[in-house]
Structures are given as C-alpha cells and as structure tokens.
Amino acid sequence: MIGRLSGILVEKQAPEVVLDVNGVGYELQVPMTSFYELPALNQAAMLFTHFVVREDAQLLYGFITKQERALFRLLIKTNGVGPKLALTILSGMTASEFVSCVERDDIATLVKLPGVGKKTAERLVIEMRDKLKSLLEASAGSEREFMLQSNYTPAAAVDSAEEDAISALLSLGYKPAQASKSVSAAFKEGMSSETLIKAALKSML
C-alpha cells in the first residue's frame, strides 16, 4: 500500500492533482481543505495517501495531514458513505468543523453538503461520535506534516478562476445552477481559483 508520496506538483485541477515522483505521475483526488494548502505548480509537495480498488478503477486519494486521512478512513467506514461522498464532506468543511458538527448534533449544517440527506447526516452523527475520540487525541497539538521548497510562492490567480471554481464544485456533486450562483456571488477581481472555491463553499454552509 502507498502511504505517502513526495514529488513535484505538475498538474492542479480541483479536486485532482498529479504528483511527479521520480518521473512517474501519480493522479490523486484531494479534498479542497488539502487543495488550498498545495503549492504552485512545479513546486515540491508531499501528500499522505489512501488507495481504493474498485472493479472499474484504482484510485489514490491525497491529504495534507495524517489527521485528514484518518477522518477520511473513518468516514468511508460509515454505512452509506463512499470515498466520493467522504471527499465532498472534507471539501465542504475542515476536520475540526466536522467534529464540531458531530459533537453538537448539527444535522442542519451537514445536510447542506451535496449528497448528504437527513438520514445520512443522522447516521454520521451517531456512528462517528465514538470514533472521533481517537482522532481528536491524535490531532491534539499536531503540526502540518507536508514539506515545501523554501522558495514556495502561492499559485497566481488565473483568468479562468470562475470556470475552475465551477468545475471543482460540479466535481464535488453540486448542481450546475448552485455552483454557478455561489461562484458568481463570491467572485472578486484578482481572486485565485483556490480562494474562490473556498469562498463559494463557505457561502453554501
């Protein structure tokens, strides 16, 4: 099993990235919470990984921290939650925000995420409450565990920021009208794709 990958970030199109490791390009699906932390293209990055084998595909999921990966693994063990929905949940809120929802029985916030109905939200709260205790203990005082080159600079804003943001939201399961409306409302001149996606997601919670 591949536990982590370190290499050069050669492609970024939320929620997918490609990491070049010694000449081999690994395609990974990453939650937006991890995507926001990634460097610009052609910079060094490291991601903790989870490997999923299906009948029709073999997929790699990448995470900035072990804690995010641990939460992803807990989510996919919940009845009715697969990797795609787990990725959507982690893209819509941070790990700490999710933990807070579970602790407060905040069904109303969880159902705002695409693909999460009332029954799924209730099941998440019930099944995840005890499982999260170990995650919280592991997360206490933890630091970000990814390495970037010392000359790292944030990715520059691009003209297609709105298109990239809408595409990312569609990939996460949001409806076209909802994605377009939230991106348009959140957009400000000079915004990068990452910043715009983050603002659009926040506006829907």
Curated annotation (Swiss-Prot):
Q: What is known of its domains?
A: Has three domains with a flexible linker between the domains II and III and assumes an 'L' shape. Domain III is highly mobile and contacts RuvB.
What GO cellular component term, any one, is given? Holliday junction helicase complex
The lineage is: Bacteria, Pseudomonadati, Pseudomonadota, Gammaproteobacteria, Alteromonadales
Q: Cite the residue spans of the region called Domain III.
A: 157-205
Q: Which UniProt keywords apply?
A: Cytoplasm, DNA damage, DNA recombination, DNA repair, DNA-binding
| Region Flexible linker, annotated ranges | 144-156
Q: Which domain of life is it from?
A: Bacteria
| HAMAP family assigned to the protein according to its UniProt record, in alphabetical order | DNA_HJ_migration_RuvA
Q: Which gene encodes it?
A: ruvA
Q: Which organism is it from?
A: Shewanella frigidimarina (strain NCIMB 400)
Compartments annotated for it: namely: Cytoplasm
| The name this protein goes by in its record | Holliday junction branch migration complex subunit RuvA
- Give the residue ranges for region: Domain II: 65-143
Q: Which InterPro entries match?
A: DNA_helicase_Holl-junc_RuvA_I (IPR013849), Hlx-hairpin-Hlx_DNA-bd_motif (IPR003583), NA-bd_OB-fold (IPR012340), RuvA (IPR000085), RuvA_2-like (IPR010994), RuvA_C (IPR011114), RuvA_C_sf (IPR036267)
